[in-house]
Amino acid sequence: NSELINSILGLPKVMNDA
C-alpha cells in the first residue's frame, strides 16, 4: 500500500524534478 501511494505521489515529483 505504501509503495503504491508513494509511486502515485512520487510520480509528479520525479517529472517535476526532471
Curated annotation (Swiss-Prot):
Keyword Cell division: no
Localization per Swiss-Prot or TrEMBL: Secreted
GO cellular component, one term: synapse
Region entry Important for DRPH activity, spans: 6-9
One GO MF term: hormone activity
Residue(s) carrying Alanine amide: A18
Keyword Secreted belongs to the record: yes
GO BP of this protein: chemical synaptic transmission; response to light stimulus
Alphabetically ordered keywords of this record: Amidation, Hormone, Neurotransmitter, Secreted
Entry similarity comment: Belongs to the arthropod PDH family.
Known role: Causes the migration of the distal retinal pigment into the proximal end of the pigment chromatophore cells and thus decreases the amount of light entering the retinulas. May also function as a neurotransmitter and/or neuromodulator.
Protein's UniProt name: Pigment-dispersing hormone
Source organism (scientific name): Leptuca pugilator (Atlantic sand fiddler crab)
Organism lineage string: Eukaryota, Metazoa, Ecdysozoa, Arthropoda, Crustacea
